[in-house]
Amino acid sequence: MTGRKEEELEGVTLLGNQGTTYTFDYNPDILEVFENKHQGRDYFVKFNCPEFTTLCPMTGQPDFATVYISYIPDVKMVESKSLKLYLFSFRNHGDFHEDAMNIIMNDLIKLMDPRYIEVWGKFTPRGGISIDPYTNYGRPGTKYEKMAEYRMMNHDLYPETVDNR
């Protein structure tokens, strides 16, 4: 197997950049992609993001979560450093938990057009309650549409032990 050629990495500008700028305001333009070299195969790419923060739109108080992103790529894949910076850009963004997870998923669909994607936010309790929004998408008219329906119906069938994180 050979490594990636320089021209395959033209759109990847943040990885390896020592002068990284952290944006504190929501910015989907930070996201970068590269080509999937294994388009003939279905496989999951999973990201665990344990330090996600956003703001409550009513009180301005911070909300903390672990965000799980899993997707089956088609042609394009999200570059991980750009994803990290994108998620960091939610730091001063005020939205409800459910909205934030759907915004993330919609931005990634627009960026990559994956075969399948799911985004799950596990927020720490605030006011005595934790909220864990789950959202997913399967490309319409394909087996991934049925997969999304199945995973939606079964995603929390055997929930983990809640330990107040």
From Swiss-Prot:
UniProt pathway annotation: tRNA modification; tRNA-queuosine biosynthesis
Q: Which InterPro entries match?
A: GTP-CH-I_C/QueF (IPR043133), NADPH_dep_7-cyano-7-deazaG_red (IPR050084), QueF (IPR029500), QueF_type1 (IPR016856)
Identify its protein family.
Belongs to the GTP cyclohydrolase I family. QueF type 1 subfamily.
What is this protein's name?
A: NADPH-dependent 7-cyano-7-deazaguanine reductase
Which cellular components does GO assign to this protein?
cytoplasm
Any one GO biological process: queuosine biosynthetic process
Q: Does the keyword Zinc apply?
A: no
Which NCBIfam families has this protein been placed in?
QueF-II
Subcellular localization is given as: Cytoplasm
